UniProtKB/Swiss-Prot annotation:
This is Mitochondrial import inner membrane translocase subunit Tim17-A. Residues 151-163 have a biased composition (Low complexity). Keywords: Disulfide bond, Membrane, Mitochondrion, Mitochondrion inner membrane, Protein transport, Translocation, Transmembrane, Transmembrane helix, Transport. Essential component of the TIM23 complex, a complex that mediates the translocation of transit peptide-containing proteins across the mitochondrial inner membrane. Disulfide bonds join C9-C78. Component of the TIM23 complex at least composed of TIMM23, TIMM17 (TIMM17A or TIMM17B) and TIMM50. The complex interacts with the TIMM44 component of the PAM complex and with DNAJC15. The chain crosses the membrane at residues 17-37, 63-77, 113-133. It is found in: Mitochondrion inner membrane.
Length: 171
């Protein structure tokens, strides 16, 4: 599955890091808004204030964590593309596993193995879903009849004579 809209590798890292930061900040903001609202004292003003405080406190931290994950994943993915010389789903699966292992390195080897397995499985599921979606979408639009590129291969049909002589304008 090739992605034609992706940036070249050095800029892909920055692009993915920024996208992950945005996704983490927005998603974390929504989650923290709900969490802050539920954990605040009774009263609309208290709940709204608690919700806003939770958003301001935790959403940027979650965005930063997502950005670290996205940047590290993209760096490993670009390195895999450079080393292997091809861009396929195995690069993403391996990058997800290595990213999970590296980010869990401070917690010991058992946590590294668990995070590597989760990262690899998660990325394998994402890549598999992308491949299935592409196959399903391409089956919706079957190829039409193939046209010959060389006009001499076409069967000769006799056109009616033209009132303008033997000149065939629309052949």
């Amino acid at each position: 599955m090739e992605e034609y809209a992706r940036e070249p590798c050095p800029w892909r890292i920055v692009d993915d890091c920024g996208g992950a930061f945005t996704m983490g900040t927005i998603g974390g903001g929504i989650f923290q808004a709900i969490k802050g609202f539920r954990n605040s004292p009774v009263g609309v003003n208290h709940r709204l204030r608690g919700s806003l405080t939770a958003i301001k406190t935790r959403a940027p931290q979650l965005g930063g964590s997502f950005a670290v994950w996205g940047g590290l994943f993209s760096m490993i993915d670009c390195s895999m593309v450079q080393v292997r010389g091809k861009e396929d789903p195995w690069n993403s699966i391996t990058s997800g596993a290595l990213t999970g292992a590296i980010l869990a390195a401070r917690n010991g080897p058992v946590a590294m193995v668990g995070s590597a397995a989760m990262g690899g499985i998660l990325l394998a599921l994402i890549e598999g879903a992308g491949i299935l979606l592409t196959r399903f979408a391409s089956a919706q639009f079957p190829n039409g009849p193939q046209f010959a590129e060389d006009p001499s291969q076409l069967p000769s049909t006799q056109l009616p004579s033209s009132p303008f002589g033997d000149y065939r304008q629309y052949q």
